[in-house]
Amino acid sequence: RYITRETAELVTGEFSRVGCPVIVSPGNHDPYTHGSIWEKIKMPDNVKVFSSDVLQCFSFPELNTDVYGYAFVSGEMTSVPLASASVADRGRINLICAHADMTSPLSHSAPLSKDVLASFGADYAALGHIHNADNYRGEAGSCSYAYCGCLVGRSFDECGDKGALVVTVDKDSDSAKAAVRTMKFSRRRYEDISVDVTGAATSREVTDKI
């Protein structure tokens, strides 16, 4: 997908001002390819971008946190980078930031099962791909997961209020607890509703009933 340099610079400028690490996992619509925006734009020092379809990890010792993920390097990915892998240190806060599809094992968008997620051993998985994400939160073993959805709905296949997830992960020696809440961003929204227009003879009368 195309993005202007002005938009990219606006986004990276905001990234540089947030005062915390930013992790990016390129997906099927913005893969990490030769000549892509990921290579053309210099990211701020606090931004880390996954660049391989093989599992990678960014470590933040000051936060006692490891973040695992990968990048799409084309428009499709049928491999499962998390399969047959596990976290390096269960004593740390272990997060996953990834573009993945938990709806079908035959998906061409990095299929991911709850069994694979559970065996990997992370504490929380921040997932992208599904824009209507309200029904895609849960637990896989000791790992909580959620899809972030999209910031703003763009059509009638993205109905309802949209926004971002704010997640707090607390971990002690025994277990981790992820608290997830939604922060609304959309000022407008798309809705799919049914309206009884019985008796309406003109477009104006239909509009009045709506």
Write out the residue ranges for each language-model feature.
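His/Asp/Glu-rich metal-coordinating catalytic cores
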Residues: 2-161, 168
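Binuclear metal-dependent phosphoesterase catalytic core
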Residues: 54-63, 147-210
